[in-house]
Regions:
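Cytosolic covalent-transfer regions centered on His/Cys nucleophiles
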Residues: 1-162
């Protein structure tokens, strides 16, 4: 039996820019690169770029670690200028030390900007993306992908209930 994809999750992933060649040496620079990807994709107004970065950076500094185990980092914040959720996905093949508890460098980044008016959607999205990224085979295929659409397909693929 397969889990039905959340329509919100599906639409968020379908519109997310995906960067396969992150090479920054600081996590703040990765966040800026992914915010710039949102701007370039038309998913974030250029005039909101600096404010989005300031909010993500504040969340990283004040709100604790967004680096998860297994090479995953999900920098995220509530961003009042938005009415919905905007996401950018990035792959850093060398990995970057983001302070994960397991000590592994982060290689898969999912930047999430959410409206404070949509707290349930924010939690649902984080839960849904985490369910997929917890699967070793999905992480492995993302790291091997040569095409953003291959990453998108992996993140949209229904996962089996356990």
């Amino acid at each position: 039996m397969y889990q039905t994809l959340c329509v919100e999750y599906d639409e968020i992933i379908r519109t997310a820019p995906i960067v396969l060649n992150l090479n920054e040496t600081l996590k703040v620079d990765v966040a800026m690169h992914l915010i710039d990807a949102l701007v370039e994709a038309g998913r974030l107004a250029p005039e909101l770029r600096n404010a989005a970065f300031a909010d993500v950076h504040a969340r990283e500094v004040l709100g604790g670690c967004t680096a998860l185990a297994n090479g995953i980092s999900i920098p995220h914040c509530r961003f009042a200028a938005l009415e919905d959720i905007r996401v950018a996905i990035g792959v850093h093949h060398d990995g970057l030390d983001c302070g994960a508890m397991d000590g592994m460098p982060s290689r898969i980044f999912v930047l999430v900007l959410s409206s404070p008016k949509q707290p349930k959607a924010h939690i649902r999205f984080l839960s849904e993306i985490n369910r997929r990224l917890l699967l070793p085979e999905i992480r492995e295929h993302i790291l091997l992908a040569n095409d953003p659409e291959a990453v998108r397909a992996l993140l949209l693929k229904p996962i089996e209930e356990s």
